[in-house]
Amino acid sequence: MDHLSSYLRSDTWVMRDDLTGFALGGNKVRKLDFLIGDALAKHADTLVVSGASSFSRNAAAAGKVFGLDVVVLVSGDEDDQNRISQAFFEEFDAQVRFLPDDAATGTAQAQLRDELTDQGRRVYELHPGGSDAIGTLGYVEAFGQICDVTDHAGVHFDRIVHASGSAATQAGLAVGSAISGYVSDLVGIAISQPESVQRHRVQNLAAE
């Protein structure tokens, strides 16, 4: 980090969420801490999630650890799938259901939820990327850890820069900042949406 700090002319720190230590790690683990807790509190026995993403892979691992069945909806057929995701789903006994490429994932997930509920399952639906009010708490907690670093290392972070995709990371950091009173510029880099759309998503999620 010394070279990067020198190049940027700033004291640059990195929060290593790739080393969160569960399954493949990453920021989604923070969200799953709260989402799995909520699922267990509601006595769910089945998780439903869409996409062959890092979030779905970590959800499959979490389901296995906590005794929850996991059903994953993915677009395309088996030959189209990411091999890493396939291996993870097989390793952790997640059931995979394939959808036509043009299928509406949200509608298909709702239909699957109803189907499993009719079979007597207690279903807990996971939003894409774990980005709902519960998952956002993972990054409210993360901001508390940033405050802890400030206290222990004696450094104040004037600017916190992060990727902003499904909005929960930025929303959680914003809420954590407001709760703690820690003054810092939060800079989210929108990775998939125009700034105006992403700003609206973050604000709505933070308000929940």
Summary of predicted features, one role per range:
Residues M1-E208:
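PLP-dependent amino-acid enzyme catalytic core
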